[in-house]
Curated annotation (Swiss-Prot):
Biological-process GO terms, alphabetical: carbohydrate metabolic process; glycerol-3-phosphate biosynthetic process; glycerol-3-phosphate catabolic process; glycerophospholipid metabolic process; phospholipid biosynthetic process
Entry's family note: Belongs to the NAD-dependent glycerol-3-phosphate dehydrogenase family.
Gene that encodes it: gpsA
Organism lineage: Bacteria, Pseudomonadati, Pseudomonadota, Alphaproteobacteria, Rickettsiales
GO molecular function: glycerol-3-phosphate dehydrogenase [NAD(P)+] activity; NAD binding
Localization: Cytoplasm
Binding-site residues, sn-glycerol 3-phosphate: K109, G137, K192, D252, S262, R263, N264
The entry's keywords: Cytoplasm, Lipid biosynthesis, Lipid metabolism, NAD, NADP, Nucleotide-binding, Oxidoreductase, Phospholipid biosynthesis, Phospholipid metabolism
NCBIfam families referenced in this protein's UniProt entry, alphabetically: PRK00094.2-5
Organism: Rickettsia felis (strain ATCC VR-1525 / URRWXCal2)
Pathway in which this enzyme or protein is active: Membrane lipid metabolism; glycerophospholipid metabolism
Protein name: Glycerol-3-phosphate dehydrogenase [NAD(P)+]
InterPro entries listed in its UniProt record: 6-PGluconate_DH-like_C_sf, 6PGD_dom2, G3P_DH_NAD-dep, G3P_DH_NAD-dep_C, G3P_DH_NAD-dep_N, NAD(P)-bd_dom_sf
A Pfam family matched in the record: NAD_Gly3P_dh_N
Spans traversing the lipid bilayer: none
Gene3D superfamilies in UniProt: N-(1-d-carboxylethyl)-l-norvaline Dehydrogenase, domain 2 (1.10.1040.10), NAD(P)-binding Rossmann-like Domain (3.40.50.720)
């Protein structure tokens, strides 16, 4: 079975740490790269990342370092940073020697900024000719770190690379599917947090379970609309496509939209029950990915003259007049 011999994970938050734990299930040479010296020491000595994952134990052979000078030596580098930090992270890693010789698996969800575009398009500028894949799935970080059953989609223009990564990550408890449609997977990952806000608002307004189920069908159509505009293979007129029904799209949507454990659903719910929307938005301090993604996707809707009613409805709630 074709696999990568060594794997680096860049990003020491909950998702990055859980992905490192996942990768270590099938690979004995996995290193988590992060900036926080205290967390690095904790993982090294205690095999926990209490700040992000509580007392969940990480694999004993998982390595950790803050020394970026060696990251260039890893065949596969998983990028798991917030969307706002994507550009700076790639630029930083370039100064430490990563190149087109390394394969990148992008687990970051959202859009690149200034200008608004997909991460795959931004990488054409930041790291030309790089071999790149994208990861998305119905994955809560703590459940992933506990090795509970889960699944994900892996997309790459080079399907052999996607399959190779799948070989590294698949196990009895973690299943994968692969695709060459990198656009649809990125679009779904970027939009799902916006739709989760809508789900939270519907919950607050007591719209009922039927409405929340109908929301999933409707938002799949909007994912397809934007995907098609950006060059994906999903069609807004034909949702009977494999990728839309896989873990990285509908699976991720259901998990995010139906769980109050999702920051975005929780935000939407609290916004929906607030008596003064403007005060709530001004005083809400927690990072909400969907709120940030919404501002960016509106640029794309305007650019391509798209009709996406759910996005527009959320914008009316979230963006102050």
């Amino acid at each position: 079975m074709n696999k990568f011999k060594n794997i680096a994970v860049y990003g020491g938050g909950s998702f990055g740490t859980s992905l490192a734990s996942l990768a270590a299930q099938n690979c004995n040479n996995v290193t988590l790269f992060l900036r926080d010296e205290e967390i690095a020491k904790e993982i090294l000595h205690n095999k926990t990342n209490v700040k992000y994952l509580g007392d969940i134990k990480l694999p004993t052979h998982l390595q950790v370092t803050t020394n970026l000078s060696v990251i260039k030596d890893f065949e596969l580098i998983i990028i798991a940073v917030p969307s706002y930090a994507f550009d700076d992270s790639i630029k930083l890693l370039k100064t430490h020697g990563i190149s087109a010789d390394n394969t990148l698996l992008i687990a970051t969800k959202g859009f690149a900024r200034n200008p608004t575009e997909l991460f795959s398009d931004r990488l054409k500028t930041l790291l030309p000719h790089s071999t790149t894949a994208f990861f998305a799935g119905s994955n809560l970080a703590k459940e992933l770190a506990k090795n509970l059953p889960a699944s994900a989609s892996i997309a790459s223009l080079d399907i052999d690379i996607a399959n190779k990564i799948a070989n590294n990550l698949s196990s009895k408890t973690f299943t994968t599917n692969t695709t060459s449609d990198i656009v649809t997977l990125q679009v779904a990952g970027a939009l799902k947090n916006i739709f989760a806000i809508k789900s939270g608002i519907d919950l607050a307004k007591k719209q009922g379970k039927n409405a929340r189920a109908t929301l999933i069908v409707t938002v799949l159509k909007e994912i397809a609309i934007l995907s098609k505009a950006l060059g994906g293979t999903a069609s807004s007129r034909s949702l009977d496509t494999n990728l839309l029904l896989e873990a990285g799209v509908v699976g991720d949507l259901v998990l995010t939209c139906y769980s109050l454990g999702s920051r975005n659903t929780k935000f939407g719910y609290e916004l929906g029950i607030s008596s003064d929307k403007k005060i709530f938005l001004r005083e809400y301090k927690e990072l909400v990915e969907g709120q940030e993604a919404l501002k960016l996707v509106l640029d794309l809707i305007k650019k391509y003259d798209l009709q996406m009613p759910i996005i527009s409805e959320v914008a009316n709630y979230v963006i102050p007049e």
